[in-house]
Amino acid sequence: MSRQVFCRKYQKEMEGLDFAPFPGAKGQEFFENVSKQAWQEWLQHQTTLINEKRLNVFEPEAKKFLEEQREKFFNNDESVEKAEGWKPE
């Protein structure tokens, strides 16, 4: 049986991640509070943002922007950036 977590994005019990997505306390927080589905959706959204905004993920400003967007995404904040001209299916 898969590990279950109370997903902070969907506010319900869902299948959890198999491992922390990155090291440290923040990675552990996501491991404990974000579902596998929500994390996959974030990865898709992040990729769209990187491509549409032509972000260099090695630049501190881009990293900060993505961290802020990640928090907004998982908190269901309406101000999360959307790629211009992109329409979800």
UniProtKB/Swiss-Prot annotation:
Matches recorded under PANTHER family: FE(2+)-TRAFFICKING PROTEIN-RELATED
Keyword tRNA processing in annotation: no
General function of this protein: Could be a mediator in iron transactions between iron acquisition and iron-requiring processes, such as synthesis and/or repair of Fe-S clusters in biosynthetic enzymes.
A GO BP annotation: cellular response to oxidative stress
Lineage: Bacteria, Pseudomonadati, Pseudomonadota, Gammaproteobacteria, Moraxellales
Pfam family, one: Iron_traffic
Annotated signal sequence range: none
One Gene Ontology term of the molecular function aspect: iron ion binding
Gene3D superfamilies listed in its UniProt record: Fe(II) trafficking protein YggX (1.10.3880.10)
UniProt similarity note: Belongs to the Fe(2+)-trafficking protein family.
Name of the protein described by the UniProt record: Probable Fe(2+)-trafficking protein
One GO CC term, this protein: cytosol
Xref: InterPro entries: Fe_traffick_prot_YggX, Fe_traffick_prot_YggX_sf
Keyword Chloroplast listed: no
This protein's UniProt keywords: Iron
